[in-house]
Every structure is written in C-alpha cells, then in structure tokens.
Regions:
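Glycine-rich beta-strand-centered segment in the early N-terminal region that forms part
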Residues: 22-39, 49-93
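C-terminal hydrophobic helical "lid"/dimerization subdomain
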Residues: 273-325
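Adenosine-nucleotide cofactor-binding segment
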Residues: 163-221, 272-274
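Glycine-rich phosphate-binding loop and adjacent beta-alpha segment
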Residues: 164, 172, 220-291, 325
Length: 325
C-alpha cells in the first residue's frame, strides 16, 4: 500500500485526509511514477474548496511532482523504467507516494536539476514561460506590472523578466517581500497594504501605464489591474488567489481604453507532448544557465499537506513549497 492525500467533501484544509491506497497499474499510454518531491500550488486549494470541480469525490490532490518511472504501459514509447521525470499537470493525485498519469503529461528531467527543484518549479515555471514568452511575448525594454511578485510564480517572473531586459513592477504585501522581489530582479515594487497600486504605476511610468498586467490574484487586484493597463493593452488574468473575478461588465474595457483581457491556462499552451517538452526545456535551460534560481523556501512532509495549504492560503509563504513523501 502507498499513502496519499485526498478529500471526501469540499471545505478548508481540515478536509484533507492522509490515507492508504493501492496505486493502479498503468494503462497502455500511462506511466507510474514514484514521487520524490511534490509541488504545492494555489490551484490545489481551488479544487479542495470547490471553486473548481474535481472529476469525482473522494478526490486526490495536486498535479505537480518529480520522481522516477517505476512502470510503463504497453504503448509508452518516450519513457522507460528508471527515467527521471517531472510533471506539472493532471490528473489530480500528485499528493501521493506513487502517481499514475498519461505519458503525454511527463517530461524528461535533466540530471543537473534535483527532484525538489523540479517539483517546486514545473507548474510555476511553465506558467511563467507561457505568460512572458507566449501570452504576451516580451521582447525586452518593456515595463510591466506583475502582482504577487514575492510568491512562487512571482519570483520566477522577476528573474525571467530581468533576463529578458524587461522592467518588472511587482506588487507585494510587506517590506520583507519587497526586498525579496527586488533581490530576484524586480525593477520596482508597490506595497499594496499602504500604497495605491494604479497611482504608483502612473508615477513609475511617467503617466504611460504598462502594456501588460499579469494578475494571478484575482478579485482583490482586478480594479487596480484595469487602471494600470495602457490603452489597447492586455490584462492577463491567470489566477484567483483572492477569489474569482465575477460580474465583469465588458463595457469597462472600452471605458479604460479599448483593453484586451485573456484568461490563459497551461493546458492550452502545453497542449501536446512536443510543446510541453519544448517549454520545459526552455525552463530547464534558464535554470542550468543560472538565469533562474528556484527558491524552495518551505518543505513539509506529505502527511502535513493541510498545514502547508493553510500557510499558502494565508500568504505566509515565499518562493516554492514542496511536500516530501
């Protein structure tokens, strides 16, 4: 028997259970992975709370991890037993000793990158890759606004933007987080606990605003995001850390300057094995070249997943958090 985290009903972290389970044999196009490290992400809390609907209850949790292939299905061609692999997408159930998932969801993990680093960077790093390199392809020289700059995604974005020659303005909730974001490459920071975000963006851009805002916070930052985008600019809403944006009046986009809004997902960009591996290879290259440093700032045992999610939701974490089986 193996161990996993599951929930039988939606609710707070207290609904998470640490239970015994029997991992399935891989189907023809599936791979069974012995997890060595598991990533913790806000999206995990969305499924637990009921904001997103899992396929069924009881449900596993998590979609990011890294480990070693221990079994492959009869039609699997890209992986063999013993391969080092990483993944950053479903099915749910990564919070486990052993996880079975489609071959197409896995990437080869270079020896130079540890399991903890991979588990702490796959979903967040691939998110930054598509945000900065595809959703709005930054060329260098732009000034952008990125909310929650001291979080796991934010710290990677700070570094990647700097490597591209982009000035990233990051929003934070404290001086300590401002210092952390700047240490990772943020050009300027705005402390939203006592500063007016949109007003500071105007000041920092000489009244021009920014061509793109990246907003993974959601409800709390939506108004400031709209007020920070330059006319005909793009607001990239990629997360709901503070709650979902609801009741949007499309007329506001006209009033604010013919704005564009997109709600991208990793699944759309990494829509096949080739695109996923290409994106991962660029991410891994940024890490091995030293341009991207992955901060594993918190480590919890798998059994303490509820505590880890509590800290994440309370915004008491920085960088990446991993669970260790």
């Amino acid at each position: 028997m193996a161990k996993r985290i599951q929930f039988r009903a939606h609710g707070g972290p207290e609904v998470l259970e640490y239970v015994d389970y029997q991992p399935a044999e891989p189907g023809p196009q599936q791979v069974r992975v012995s997890n060595k490290a598991i990533g913790l992400n806000f999206i995990d809390t969305y499924y637990r709370s009921g904001l997103y609907a899992p396929p069924a209850l009881p449900s596993g949790v998590g979609a990011e991890g890294a480990g070693i292939v221990e079994a492959v299905g009869s039609e699997v061609t890209r992986f063999k037993v013993g391969d080092r692999v990483a993944y950053g997408s479903g099915p749910l159930g990564a919070y486990s000793d052993v996880h079975v998932l489609p071959e197409a969801n896995l990437v080869h993990l270079p020896d130079a990158i540890s399991f903890e680093t991979a588990a702490g960077v796959m979903l967040k790093g691939l998110t930054v890759q598509y945000l900065l390199r595809q959703t709005y392809e930054l060329k260098g020289g732009e000034t952008i606004l990125f909310h929650a700059a001291a979080g796991g995604v934010g710290l990677l974005a700070c570094q990647w933007a700097k490597a591209l020659g982009v000035k990233l303005i990051g929003t934070v909730s404290s001086k300590a987080k401002a210092d952390l974001a700047k240490a990772h490459g943020a050009w300027e920071t705005i402390d939203y606990s006592h500063e007016n975000v949109a007003q500071r963006v105007l000041e920092l851009t000489d009244g021009k605003k920014v061509p793109v805002v990246y907003d993974g916070v959601g409800k709390d930052t939506w108004p400031a995001s709209l007020d920070s985008v330059a006319p005909r600019g793009l607001l990239v809403s990629f997360g709901n850390a503070s709650g979902a944006v609801e009741g949007v009046n499309l007329g506001i986009l006209a009033a604010k300057g013919s704005l564009y809004v997109t709600r991208p997902t990793l699944a759309t960009y990494a829509n096949n094995a080739e695109n996923l591996q290409r994106m991962a290879d660029e991410l891994f290259g940024m890490i091995t070249s030293g341009k991207l440093k992955v901060d594993i700032s918190q480590r919890y045992s798998l059994a303490d997943a509820a505590k880890a999610q509590t800290e994440l939701s309370a915004r008491r974490t920085t960088g990446s958090t991993v669970l260790l089986p």
